[in-house]
């Protein structure tokens, strides 16, 4: 069964590739998942994934952005889960493309920060975040887990730039933390996760997420109410049991008829209706209705009398 995150990614890979924004999305893929190789003084660039839809997406992004069809190689993993592995290999104009995407600088080498032309464009930010989520993102199922969406980065400065894109353009309240082999930017608020899905274009996933979130919140509210009612019932039952115990002691030692009239009425009514709450007793007592504090005062008198009889 496909995970919730894989369903979100499936929707994102089905979106139309827009020529103006293909480079921003591709830049995220290559910066985060690309492996640069050098053979016979020639660069090649590999991106490997187990998701065929993501492999097709990368293939199409390269074709739309640069008019080049990369190689698509399918192999079978022999260790652990024997899934197919998809390798997209670019072996033409690699350095030119990496320089154009601001991933490679001839003088400085690898550039790990997100370029300013993307940092200063909301449309570019949307496309880059989409690519980043497809390359290194995950999101928990809102129905079964705690709310959590994250994107993993190898480089700290890249992680900082992702958080800046999320927060400065889309107010997502993204947080950062270090992992053993890298860094993550993450969201914990359900509403912000829904906003992120909308930003990157996963509209169906966003609507589904909101439906599941609302249902989960409703269930939690009902459970809280049930728990509260149960606690109140236990509290009522405990108080009633103590009151009945006091009255039964008075009845045994002195008799209810020995009590003042108001206490007699309350004592007999409580013995007949041990299930009622204090408010219900106050409303339904034969010489009432009276206030809860009035009923409570009478019960206190009965308790004091019962305590003297125990001595």
UniProtKB/Swiss-Prot annotation:
Pfam families: HTH_WhiA (PF02650), LAGLIDADG_WhiA (PF14527), WhiA_N (PF10298). Coiled coil: none annotated. One of its GO terms (biological process) is regulation of sporulation. Keywords: Cell cycle, Cell division, DNA-binding. One of its GO terms (molecular function) is DNA binding. Residues 277-311 bind DNA. Transmembrane segments: none annotated. The keyword Translocase does not apply. HAMAP family: HTH_type_WhiA (MF_01420). NCBIfam families: DNA_bind_WhiA. Involved in cell division and chromosome segregation. Belongs to the WhiA family. This is Probable cell division protein WhiA.
């Amino acid at each position: 069964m496909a995970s919730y995150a894989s369903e979100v990614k499936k929707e994102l890979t089905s979106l139309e590739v827009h020529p103006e924004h293909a480079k921003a999305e591709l830049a995220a893929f290559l910066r985060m998942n690309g492996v640069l190789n050098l053979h016979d003084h020639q660069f090649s660039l590999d991106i490997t994934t187990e998701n065929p839809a993501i492999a097709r997406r990368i293939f199409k992004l390269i074709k739309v952005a640069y008019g080049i069809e990369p190689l698509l190689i399918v192999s079978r993993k022999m260790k652990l889960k024997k899934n197919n592995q998809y390798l997209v290999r670019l072996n033409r104009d690699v350095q030119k493309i990496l320089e154009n995407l601001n991933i490679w600088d001839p003088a400085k080498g690898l550039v790990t920060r997100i370029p300013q032309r993307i940092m200063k464009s909301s449309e570019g930010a949307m496309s880059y975040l989409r690519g980043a989520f497809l390359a290194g993102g995950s999101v928990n199922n809102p129905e079964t887990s705690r709310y959590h969406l994250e994107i993993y980065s190898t480089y700290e400065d890249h992680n900082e730039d992702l958080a800046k894109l999320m927060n400065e353009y889309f107010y997502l309240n993204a947080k950062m933390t270090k992992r053993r082999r890298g860094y993550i930017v993450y969201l914990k608020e359900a509403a912000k996760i829904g906003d992120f899905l909308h930003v990157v274009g996963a509209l169906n996933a966003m609507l589904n997420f909101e439906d599941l979130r609302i249902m989960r919140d409703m269930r939690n509210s009902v459970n809280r109410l049930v728990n509260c009612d149960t606690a109140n019932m236990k509290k009522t039952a405990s108080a009633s049991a103590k009151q009945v115990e006091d009255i039964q002691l008075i009845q045994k030692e002195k008799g209810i008829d020995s009590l003042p009239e108001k206490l007699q009425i309350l004592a007999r009514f409580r013995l007949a209706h041990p299930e009622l709450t204090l408010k219900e007793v106050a409303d339904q007592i034969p010489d009432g209705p009276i206030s809860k504090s009035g009923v409570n005062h009478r019960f206190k008198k009965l308790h004091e009398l019962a305590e003297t009889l125990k001595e």
